[in-house]
């Protein structure tokens, strides 16, 4: 990342100094990025590791190691705006037209999903972010921030991100998704993959209005009228508005069938039985119900669309990259005040994006799928390059330890409390599996007339 990019972010945020300091704003941004890169280290150790990069940026008095108090005050003085501007400059899919795994049906594969980050317990953080409800209605646990991002599946590059306190108003994933849609980051030529949390009409219609195509998993109980059956086994349907859905539900309870097609978003309904056959063990079959705005089965056959949905897991992998490998497993963010938390999250996103950019660059040099480039090896190489001032070695080191082609494996997902996690005997990770997709036509007859 060129230093000029940081200088532009500082200028765009209006953080230029009125006088020269030991730690000017550009140096503070570098230091905050270092805190995200070396998250488990204290301020003093981070400053020592980055001394070779910070000393040329020091003020006219020359460089000496600042105290932790001076570093904390410098962070507060800079605020979150420069890091937000820097992330905006770095954000993007990182995929070219020939990047393996980045495209499907002529569209850029992206995924939309959220996660949470724990922040330190302080009065300021509680006031800004709130705390999750505890037992017997009492507030308990750590305050949390909900982060939602739009990620390119092929490279795990972060296209956009938004976050808010979990207990704040309008902090649900659906509200945050509408915020990303309003920013203009969802555009025609994208195929957005999302889970069942985004299958309601208000959020799906907002996302579709951007011109991007959608592929969303829906609940088995969600009402989707079958208007007609298509040659590939999928069906024409409509994601009804809440008012239309209620009108048809009331009519069905009275034993009536309304003749008109409900108002809403036209979609294709795809129901598929996914059979996973491990090399040793018992096969298991799961029903997957999807809706998509790819309405033409000739250009997007149902079986291929259903197989494409598996790429949504890439955003889960990207959150593992951020929370486990970059921040550290189970770690809190550092700051005890909201502005510092906001600054840290933008810095973490910048570090993740820079690491994914290094992965994408390394993969491009050998026409490899970016999945073959290890995130952890690339991140360690970047850390080592910064501390030894040998910039440029991260790409070659990442290429020297390629991952094998990704295998199909089965690891059933569990949602457990902390106590249950300690007690659960989780099934072992299986070896290579075979996945079979069978498209099924919905058994229920349509309650609507028409072709």
Predicted regions and their residues:
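Single, function-defining residue in the core of a domain
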Residues: 1-49, 75-78, 85-88, 104-108, ...
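Short edge-strand/loop segments of extracellular domains
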Residues: 53
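Major-groove recognition helix of helix-turn-helix-like DNA-binding domains
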Residues: 59-78
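A short, well-structured juxtamembrane/interface segment
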Residues: 92-98
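Noncatalytic carbohydrate-binding groove/subsite architecture in carbohydrate-active enzymes
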Residues: 101
């Amino acid at each position: 990342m060129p230093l000029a990019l940081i200088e532009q972010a500082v200028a765009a945020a209006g953080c230029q100094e009125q006088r020269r300091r030991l730690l000017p704003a550009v140096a503070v941004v570098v230091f905050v990025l270092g805190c995200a890169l070396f998250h488990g280290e204290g301020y003093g150790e981070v400053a020592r590791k980055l001394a070779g990069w910070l000393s040329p940026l020091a003020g006219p008095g020359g460089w000496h190691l600042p105290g932790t108090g001076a570093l904390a005050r410098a962070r507060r003085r800079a605020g979150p705006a420069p890091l937000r501007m820097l992330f905006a400059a770095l954000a993007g899919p990182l995929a070219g037209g020939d990047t393996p795994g980045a495209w499907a049906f002529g569209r850029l594969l992206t995924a939309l999903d959220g996660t949470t980050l724990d922040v330190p317990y302080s009065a300021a953080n509680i006031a800004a972010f709130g705390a999750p409800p505890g037992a017997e209605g009492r507030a308990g646990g750590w305050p949390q921030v909900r982060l939602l991002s739009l990620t390119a599946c092929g490279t795990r590059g972060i296209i956009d991100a938004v976050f808010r306190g979990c207990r704040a108003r309008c902090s649900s994933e659906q509200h945050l998704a509408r915020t990303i849609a309003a920013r203009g980051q969802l555009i025609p030529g994208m195929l957005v993959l999302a889970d069942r949390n985004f299958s309601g009409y208000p959020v799906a219609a907002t996302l579709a209005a951007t011109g991007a195509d959608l592929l969303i998993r829906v609940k088995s109980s969600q009402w989707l009228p079958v208007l007609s059956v298509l040659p590939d086994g999928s069906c024409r349907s409509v994601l009804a508005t809440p008012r239309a859905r209620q009108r048809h539900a009331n009519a069905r309870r009275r034993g009536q069938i309304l003749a008109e097609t409900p108002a809403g978003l036209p979609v294709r309904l795809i129901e598929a039985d996914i059979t996973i056959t491990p090399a040793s063990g018992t096969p298991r079959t799961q029903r997957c119900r999807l809706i998509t705005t790819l309405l033409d089965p000739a250009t997007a056959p149902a079986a291929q669309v259903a197989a494409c949905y598996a790429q949504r897991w890439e955003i889960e992998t990207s959150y593992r990259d951020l929370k486990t490998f970059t921040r550290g497993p189970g770690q809190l963010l550092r700051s005890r005040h909201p502005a510092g938390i906001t600054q840290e999250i933008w810095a973490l996103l910048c570090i993740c994006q820079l690491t994914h950019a290094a992965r994408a660059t390394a993969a491009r040099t050998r026409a490899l799928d970016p999945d073959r480039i290890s995130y952890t090896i690339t991140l360690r190489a970047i850390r080592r390059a910064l501390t030894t001032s040998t910039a440029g070695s991260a790409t070659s080191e990442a290429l020297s330890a390629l991952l094998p082609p990704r295998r199909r494996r089965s690891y059933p997902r569990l949602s457990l409390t902390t106590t249950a996690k300690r007690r659960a005997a989780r099934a072992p990770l299986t070896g290579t599996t075979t996945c079979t997709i069978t498209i099924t036509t919905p058994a229920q007859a349509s309650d609507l007339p028409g072709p």
